[in-house]
């Protein structure tokens, strides 16, 4: 079954399983790094919001031999996990005073998001772009944000500096830093990634950590939290290697570790192509944190 036929089958079969007053749409959704996914939206007429379920991964399930019935069950299960239970009033976004304490920043690839960056306020940082969002995760059953666009900034009547100040105060408070032992995490969650990492260094015996946030979502921005890198450098004994594992986290280790730095960039590219979703790739090279100057390069 080709992809277009798969989408039609999903739409037809899901519609047949819903009550008559429900509506279903499939539409393209722009994601990070210029990726476009097909989003399934199941609309309950009682509420003004609905979760978006991306169908592209389910097609890979189908190609791997998973039955259509099992895929339909999984899609409906996902919908039930995130279906709305009340209306969501988005009008508060029109008033900056109501969202000022919800402004956060996120780190994304600069090169891979050139088209998106034309319409949003951002700051260039190394090979990344710092963009700004309104965090609405507290009001929704999933990690929810609304990207701050140039149009929204104009509506608020503020400048980028105001966004920066608000986000620096809010992001560490809303999404506190989380530092996780990498060996323990990868052995449990990502054995494939762990095996690839062993080809570069003996990470089982080295002090290496995952730097993310409390939600482990869009957590790579935690490297920007005031004092986080300097504090971690004291723990690790000096300068550090920073590896952009994905938009969700950085891997951090001592610079003087027994690690093959020459092959590290090649390793990052390989992991990006095999273990990280296209829309979650952050960077393709490593960085160094200088503990004496408190800078990253």
Q: What is the predicted function of each stretch?
A:
Residues 267-289, 294-296:
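Helix-rich interaction surfaces within compact, conserved domain-sized segments
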Residues 26-29, 242-245, 278-285:
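A generic structural motif
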Residues 87-123, 127, 137-141:
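Conserved, function-critical positions that sit in or immediately flank catalytic
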Residues 1-105:
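An N-terminal, globular interaction/scaffold subdomain
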Residues 32-39, 251-254, 294-297:
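Short, solvent-exposed polar/charged micro-motifs at secondary-structure junctions
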Residues 119-275:
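A contiguous, surface-oriented mixed alpha/beta subdomain in the mid-to-C-terminal portion of proteins
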Residues 28-34, 248-249, 286-292:
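A glycine-rich phosphate-binding loop feature that marks nucleotide/adenosyl-phosphate handling sites
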Residues 46, 254-257, 289-293:
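Short acidic-glycine loop/turn motifs at beta-strand connectors
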């Amino acid at each position: 079954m080709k992809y277009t036929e798969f989408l039609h089958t999903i739409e037809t079969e899901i519609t047949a399983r819903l009550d008559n007053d429900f509506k279903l749409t499939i539409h393209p959704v722009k994601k990070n790094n210029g990726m476009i996914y097909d989003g399934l939206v199941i609309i309950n007429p009682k509420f003004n919001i609905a979760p978006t379920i991306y169908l592209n991964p389910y097609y890979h399930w189908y190609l791997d031999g998973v039955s259509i019935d099992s895929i339909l069950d999984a899609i409906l299960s996902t919908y039930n996990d995130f279906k709305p239970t009340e209306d969501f009033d988005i009008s508060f976004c029109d008033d900056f005073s109501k969202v000022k304490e919800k402004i956060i920043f996120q780190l994304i690839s600069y090169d891979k998001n050139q088209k998106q960056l034309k319409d949003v306020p951002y700051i260039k940082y190394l090979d990344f772009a710092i963009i700004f969002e309104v965090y609405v995760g507290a009001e929704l059953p999933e990690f929810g944000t609304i990207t701050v666009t140039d149009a929204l900034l104009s509506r608020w009547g503020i400048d980028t500096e105001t966004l920066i100040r608000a986000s620096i105060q809010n992001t560490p408070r809303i999404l506190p830093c989380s530092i996780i032992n990498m060996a323990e995490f990868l052995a449990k969650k990502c054995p494939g990634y762990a095996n690839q990492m062993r080809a570069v260094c003996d990470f089982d015996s080295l002090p290496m950590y995952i730097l993310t946030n409390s939600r482990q979502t869009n957590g790579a921005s935690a490297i920007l939290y005031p004092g986080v890198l300097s504090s971690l450098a004291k723990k690790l004994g000096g300068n550090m290697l920073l590896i952009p594992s994905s938009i969700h986290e950085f891997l951090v280790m001592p610079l003087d570790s027994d690690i093959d730095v020459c092959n590290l960039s090649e390793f990052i590219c390989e992991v990006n192509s095999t273990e990280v979703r296209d829309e979650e790739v952050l960077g393709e090279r490593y960085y160094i944190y200088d503990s004496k100057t408190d800078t990253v390069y």
